[in-house]
Amino acid sequence: MDFDAIVIGGGHAGIEAALALSRLDFKTLMITQNLDTIGKLSCNPAIGGLAKGNMVREIDALGGEMGRIIDFSMIQFRVLNKSRGPAVQAPRAQADKLMYQTKAKETLERQDNLDLFQDTVVDFLLNSMRNEIKGVVTERGNKFRSNVVVLTTGTFLRGKIFIGEYRANMGRLAEFSAYGLDKTLLSLGFEMGRLKTGTPARIHKKSVDFSKTEVQFGDSDIIPFSFSNGNLDKSQLSCYVTYTNKRTHEIISENMHLSPLYSGEIVGNGPRYCPSIEDKIVKFKDKDRHQIFIEPEGFNTEEMYLNGLSSSLPENIQQKFINSIEGLEHAIITRPGYAVEYDYINPIELYPNLESKRVKGLFVAGQTNGSSGYEEAAAQGLMAGINAALRLQNKKPMILTRTSSYIGVLIDDLVTKGTKEPYRMFTSRAEHRLNLRHDTSDKRLIKIGYDLGLVDEERYSKYLFKKRRVEEIKELLKQRRLSLKDVADEQLKKHVSKDFYHILKDPSISLDNLIKIDPSLSDSKVILEQVELDVKYEGYINRQKDLIKKLNNLELVKLPFDFNYEIIEGLSREAREKFSKVQPATLAQASRIPGIRNTDITVLFIYFSNPKNKVVLNFSL
């Protein structure tokens, strides 16, 4: 059977890729090992968080689905870092895991141009030169032809789980791993490796003594992840906080020899910023305790997730150290924690549009690329789906820059630097994070989604109204001046005769203070928050914009794909090797490759500025 596009895998990357392709009118097939586990939240029951929440809103602004699914399935909402600056604040929501999964599958099933099929892909169909994708072959012998394939295998490609001495060829507990494609990829010359991740035990709610824990409530004001949603009024469940203690650490230390992490059996690197409890005990010996969050997994389940206690120790040891924690003395484990090791492709093998350098038409996204997390996977899946569609249309790739989005930072880091450990997004990875606030995701990206055809007229019109209203209120602030009769408190006295716009720049004055004086400035909370942040941080934002403009000049110097850098005289040996391997798309990407010197960038610029080298510069220095 023939399709325009095939997506391998039904996780968060696969969902976004399949929806993007089908919504852009391409006949798409998603093949996954189990249709009942589409969109499964394999580890923590939450979406969003620092930088991750920003990415979810960026996905939504571009026309992706993750924001709408979490808005539908959330059971608690919080803004993290609320006491800090807006650049590092981020929305996070606990999810009802089953509700999230069900909604994801339902969305796929109801999508036009999209078919779902349960099977395991074991090989590719390729052209005679073995450098162009033509389709896939499944375990049961089915052959499906297509001109593009998006590969999103998650933790299932040669996945292996570890619980003490127990080993099983699985990508998740009780779910078999996938074999076949690993051999195909190796035979095609892909640089591959092993990575490791893990998950904690789940326990029964009835066995927890919540009186010994700290309760953590959600925020009363819920900010929807999707810009298409208005106010959300949701019932919320509480989370709880407890801590490990000296006895917990002793139990783990005494049994460290039983951990496959420290016996040498696991060769893959684990996530640096989401370590197992064994790692924490070894690496942070000076800490007397570690914080543990007890999180509900949904409205209709009694299972609780122990955030911060990921472990692959034997089940009896897990039971022992969990019972040493206050509030969990009688905790009953329903599912043990475990580690999972899996194959990944070094993302340096990919162009910035997430297409393979070795096989035309093969796009790769998610944990297969060495990333970690639902949000990182969904972001890559969306971009891979969009670029696969553009490949089918013979159009230029759509590549987001580092200055435009966290998604741009994520993909640029992966394809430029590669990775030897699961890559997780943080606000600190973005050089211009004040310009990447979660509330401005639509301002930055929705026009791109609209032009692509993923954002409909209704959503785009709603955004244009919001944009217009924000500017109208800013103009009103500039026109309105403070008179002496308006002053009701001492804070405002020094601002008499100034316009409201400049008064609002005072850190001690809020927009609410000014609305009390002039109620005509009032509007929805979303619009007022954006106005206030734009005005208060205008100076910083403008300085960043000036810097971004200069940096974007380097982005405008496009470099050819599949270029032989050995012919350029004056490049260092290291630069020749790294440019040949990475094949940077722009001079800016070339400058970010580790180990590259400014002199190498100058040599490149001079070489490609020469008209005889057939590279057109899109700006004047």
Swiss-Prot record:
Its biological purpose is as follows: NAD-binding protein involved in the addition of a carboxymethylaminomethyl (cmnm) group at the wobble position (U34) of certain tRNAs, forming tRNA-cmnm(5)s(2)U34.
Name the Pfam families on file. Answer: GIDA (PF01134), GIDA_C_1st (PF21680), SAM_GIDA_C (PF13932)
Picking any one GO biological process from the record gives: tRNA wobble uridine modification
Residues binding NAD(+) are 270-284
Family annotation (NCBIfam families): mnmG_gidA
Q: What protein name is recorded for this chain?
A: tRNA uridine 5-carboxymethylaminomethyl modification enzyme MnmG
Listed InterPro entries: FAD/NAD-bd_sf, GIDA_C_N, MnmG, MnmG-rel, MnmG-rel_CS, MnmG_C, MnmG_C_subdom, MnmG_C_subdom_sf
Family note: Belongs to the MnmG family.
Query: Which gene holds the coding sequence for this protein?
Result: mnmG
Q: Which Gene3D superfamilies match?
A: FAD/NAD(P)-binding domain (3.50.50.60), GidA associated domain, C-terminal subdomain (1.10.150.570), tRNA uridine 5-carboxymethylaminomethyl modification enzyme MnmG/GidA (1.10.10.1800)
Q: At which positions is FAD bound?
A: G9, G10, G11, H12, A13, G14
- Species annotation: Borrelia garinii subsp. bavariensis (strain ATCC BAA-2496 / DSM 23469 / PBi) (Borreliella bavariensis)
